[in-house]
From Swiss-Prot:
Residue ranges of domain PNT in the record: 119-203
DNA-binding stretch(es), residue numbering of this chain: 239-322
GO terms under cellular component: nucleus
Main location: nucleus
Entry function: May function as an androgen-independent transactivator of the prostate-specific antigen (PSA) promoter. Binds to 5'-GGAT-3' DNA sequences. May play a role in the regulation of the prostate gland and/or prostate cancer development. Acts as a transcriptional activator for SERPINB5 promoter.
Family label: Belongs to the ETS family.
Tissue-specific expression: Expressed in the accessory glands of sex organs including the prostate, seminal vesicle, coagulating gland in males, the oviduct in females, and in intestines. Expression is epithelial-specific.
Pfam families associated with the record: Ets, SAM_PNT
Residue ranges, annotated region (Disordered): 27-50, 79-100
Compartments it resides in: Nucleus
Annotated GO biological process: cell fate commitment; epithelial cell fate commitment; glandular epithelial cell development; intestinal epithelial cell development; lung goblet cell differentiation; negative regulation of cell fate commitment; negative regulation of transcription by RNA polymerase II; positive regulation of apoptotic process
Protein name, entry field: SAM pointed domain-containing Ets transcription factor
Alphabetical UniProt keywords: Activator, DNA-binding, Nucleus, Transcription, Transcription regulation
Length: 325
């Protein structure tokens, strides 16, 4: 993607904190706020200079988007014109707690999860158009990172934190832990980290459903592995756990804190965060109840199949692919 918008980091707070739905405070409120003292003043967003200007139009003009990227914004007035007669919202599936067994509950949970994921993907697509950035945080330039930070701060009413992440590109940002986010941004760092994880997961899901070059799809260990990322679809075949683990290992900038190579040539890897790896596997298989106990049992099944084994020097959560990458 392109470089940062000119002067993004030097914009005054009055320009950064624009919320069309936040009304300006009265003189009485300002006086009351001043009486609190500098230590007790709460951070509050400023209203836009032109209240009639929509947030979408503001971002397009501020970030100087390309004309062809902004054509979809013309539909906004039409949508507002129909606000007097809103359509009936879709109803979430009802989970029947009296149903026998857990099959119905799991099915309902999967439906809810699919609906939520769909809405998240739509929101991310909209943000990408507004900010002119890619959906994969690992590909962001330092300027793209600043745009995303500004957007997230506006969306979730967070105090500005752009200066704390200056000069960081997408790969560096994705490699940071939640604690590192908190150190750089004590107020809101955990929220930023959580939403970055959502963006990474969304990019991962979008990538695995898009067509790509053919990679290793064999279900046994009789063939060698190819370099590059695994095509999870494998011509319609369900993804196997060992393929999923390889996907994570091939994206160290996104998942290096969860799973990493100890010796790539020998195929030895370590699961650093078993709970997170299990959670990601549950998302991939659409199984919200997935945990590491279930995942580890699946890994042990590969011992007999000759796909994964324990290395010569056995260590906890350390495994070895029989046929190295």
């Amino acid at each position: 993607m392109g470089s940062a918008s000119p002067g993004l980091s030097n914009v005054s707070p009055g320009c950064l904190l624009l919320f069309p739905d936040v009304a300006p405070r009265t003189g009485t409120e300002k006086a009351a706020s001043g009486a609190m003292g500098p230590e007790k003043q709460e951070w509050s967003p400023s209203p836009p200079a032109t209240p009639e200007q929509g947030l979408s139009a503001f971002y397009l003009s501020y970030f100087n988007m390309y004309p062809d990227d902004s054509s979809w914004v013309a539909k906004v007035p039409e949508a507002r014109a129909g606000e007097d007669h809103p359509e009936e919202p879709e109803q979430c599936p009802v989970i029947d707690s009296q149903a026998s067994g857990s099959t119905l509950d799991e099915h309902s949970l999967e439906q809810v999860q699919s609906m939520v994921v769909g809405e998240v993907l739509k929101d991310i697509e909209t943000a990408c158009k507004l900010l002119n950035i890619t959906a994969d945080p690992g590909d962001w330039s330092p300027g793209n990172v600043q745009k995303w930070l500004l957007w997230t701060e506006h969306q979730y009413r967070l105090p500005p934190a752009g200066k704390a992440f200056q000069e960081l590109g997408g790969k560096e940002l994705c490699a940071m832990s939640e604690e590192q986010f908190r150190q750089r941004a004590p107020l809101g760092g955990d929220v930023l980290h959580a939403h970055l994880d959502i963006w990474k997961s969304a990019a991962w899901m979008k990538e695995r459903t898009s067509p790509g070059t053919l990679h290793y799809c064999a279900s046994t260990s009789e063939e060698g592995w190819t370099d590059g990322e695994v095509d999870s679809s494998c011509s319609g075949q369900p993804i196997h756990l060992w393929q999923f683990l390889k996907e994570l290992l091939l994206k160290p900038h996104s998942y290096g804190r969860f799973i990493r190579w100890l010796n790539k040539e020998k195929g030895i890897f370590k699961i650093e965060d078993s709970a997170q790896v299990a959670r990601l596997w549950g998302v991939r298989k659409n199984r919200p109840a997935m945990n590491y106990d279930k995942l580890s049992r699946s890994i042990r099944q590969y011992y007999k199949k000759g796909i994964i084994r324990k290395p010569d020097i056995s260590q906890r959560l350390v495994y070895q692919f029989v046929h190295p990458v």
